[in-house]
Amino acid sequence: MLDEELCNYATELVNFIQTKEFAPVTQRKPYYHMGATITDAILQAGLNYHHVVYPRVLKILVEYSDYKTTCDFIILMQLFPLVEIVNFKNSKKLQRIRDLSWFLYNNGVENEDQLAKWLDVEKNISLLKKVNGIGPKTVDYLKILSGNQAIAIDRHLFAFLEMAGISHCSYNEAHLIYSKVAEMLNISLYELDKKIWLYMAKK
């Protein structure tokens, strides 16, 4: 995408945003529980967040509050079946939770603060994308969950672009447009992400 084209799309989207009303949002804080962070990151793809994902994340936070680090979560998975911990039966998702947990443990990532710093290194992101089921959206979502500034382009954000008359964008193109819009509006990436997500989730 050329710089001129990016600026044109971003300006178009800014103008569209200014015709809408959005609920106020505050900066998201990490869970400070890697089991919850990993579970949220893996389950969010393709599932209803409020009805399916967050209740399971909350279950981990409440019932296994002492198992905060990546190592703790791996130990927890040795003590109880993961299907019971998460209360979820999809074997593919459960295996991805295991895979991501071991990957982060093997890379010395034990908490969200370490994860935030680790995700700032480009070569680490390249390694992370080699884990089965981890694509650019999950990487960006992990950045958000760790407290970093990021925007994770999901179906809601793609649909919002379509509403603004901007269609057929790749993930990277949409990411560039939204990043430019956040800069133009002088708001954080997370704030832009959350405002649009909440707006579209009500539709």
Task: Name each region found by the language model.
Residues 52-55, 92, 152, 169, ...:
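Alpha-helix N-cap and coil->helix boundary residues
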